[in-house]
């Protein structure tokens, strides 16, 4: 895996955790909002997998953040 891919994957993982905890949500809560399981959300946050782009887009809308923010490209 390329270094840039690893950086983006880690940024997404951290942003997902940050957005969820900043909003006082559980992984179950997030899963319900986007129609995914708690296990899927946990897998993303552990860096085992990534949400697809459509799911990441829906999360960015829910959290009122840009896709660039979710990918670690802006503060």
Model-predicted segments: where are they?
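Short amphipathic recognition helices of helix-turn-helix/homeodomain-type DNA-binding modules
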Residues: 69-75
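The alpha-helix within a helix-turn-helix
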Residues: 20, 31, 60
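Short alpha-helical DNA-recognition segment
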Residues: 23-43
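The DNA-contacting recognition helix of HTH DNA-binding domains
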Residues: 27, 38, 48-49, 67
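A short, Lys/Arg-rich alpha-helix, primarily the initiator
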Residues: 1-22
């Amino acid at each position: 895996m390329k270094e840039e891919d690893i950086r983006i994957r880690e940024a997404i993982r951290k942003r997902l955790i940050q957005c969820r905890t900043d909003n006082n949500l559980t992984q179950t809560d997030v899963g319900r909002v986007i129609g995914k399981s708690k296990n899927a959300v946990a897998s993303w946050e552990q860096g085992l997998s990534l949400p697809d782009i459509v799911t990441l887009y829906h999360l960015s809308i829910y959290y009122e953040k840009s896709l660039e923010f979710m990918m670690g490209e802006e503060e």
